């Protein structure tokens, strides 16, 4: 892959994808005047396909979309596919984190288990009948308060026992090796034709 459209407007995702996909030339959809597709799917995979197809159809080029989010089993999978808008459509990362911490205030350590799930869809063209789908999972625990300034989204409350810090305290070099997005992209690379 020499050039690909990134079907996202999320600056954090764009930065991570550009780092993880190098040396591929990544063109954020906004650079081409493409707005986000409406996420009407019922799963991360459905939403990734919708977003990749939308960007590919408008750019007339291959497009890659990532739909990912935080899953907390003790909250019946919340925030799940609604991770970016957990505290409402106009919410920012801090609002979403506060909503999550509020819902988890009375939960025990065992009930604070969580994971990030990433689904990546690569469409060679808008009518691609066989998009390449890859997934990755990143396990952790939801901390009781935010810590760290790296990353984005729920990273400041996503605690990693193995590293004794949150994802927001990890250096990008380490996070880009172990995260759900890194795992999904590694799987995608293995699925790409030579």
From Swiss-Prot:
Pfam families the record matches: Ham1p_like (PF01725)
Reactions performed catalytically: XTP + H2O = XMP + diphosphate + H(+); dITP + H2O = dIMP + diphosphate + H(+); ITP + H2O = IMP + diphosphate + H(+)
One GO process term, biological-process aspect: purine nucleoside triphosphate catabolic process
E.C. designation(s): 3.6.1.66
Residues binding Mg(2+), per UniProt: 38, 67
Gene3D superfamilies in the cross-refs: 3.90.950.10
UniProt cross-references to InterPro entries, sorted A to Z: dITP/XTP_pyrophosphatase, ITPase-like_fam, RdgB/HAM1
CDD domains: HAM1 (cd00515)
Cofactor remark from the record: Binds 1 Mg(2+) ion per subunit.
Quaternary organization: Homodimer.
Protein name according to UniProt: dITP/XTP pyrophosphatase
Organism: Legionella pneumophila (strain Paris)
């Amino acid at each position: 892959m020499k050039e690909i459209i990134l079907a996202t407007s999320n600056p954090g995702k764009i930065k991570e994808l550009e780092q993880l996909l190098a040396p591929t030339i990544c063109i954020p959809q906004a650079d081409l005047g493409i707005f986000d597709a409406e996420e009407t799917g019922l799963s991360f995979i459905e939403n990734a396909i919708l977003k990749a197809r939308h960007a590919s159809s408008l750019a007339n080029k291959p497009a890659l979309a990532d739909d990912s989010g935080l899953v907390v089993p003790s909250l019946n999978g919340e925030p799940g596919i609604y991770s970016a808008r957990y505290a409402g459509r106009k919410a920012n990362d801090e609002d979403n984190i506060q909503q999550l911490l509020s819902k988890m205030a009375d939960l025990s350590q065992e009930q604070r288990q969580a994971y990030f799930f990433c689904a990546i869809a690569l469409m060679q063209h808008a009518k691609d009948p066989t998009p390449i789908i890859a997934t990755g999972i990143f396990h952790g625990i939801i901390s009781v308060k935010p810590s760290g300034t790296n990353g984005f989204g729920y990273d400041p409350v996503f605690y990693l026992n193995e590293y004794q810090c949150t994802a927001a305290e990890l250096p990008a070099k380490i996070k880009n090796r172990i995260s759900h997005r890194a795992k999904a992209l590694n799987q995608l690379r293995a699925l790409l034709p030579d």
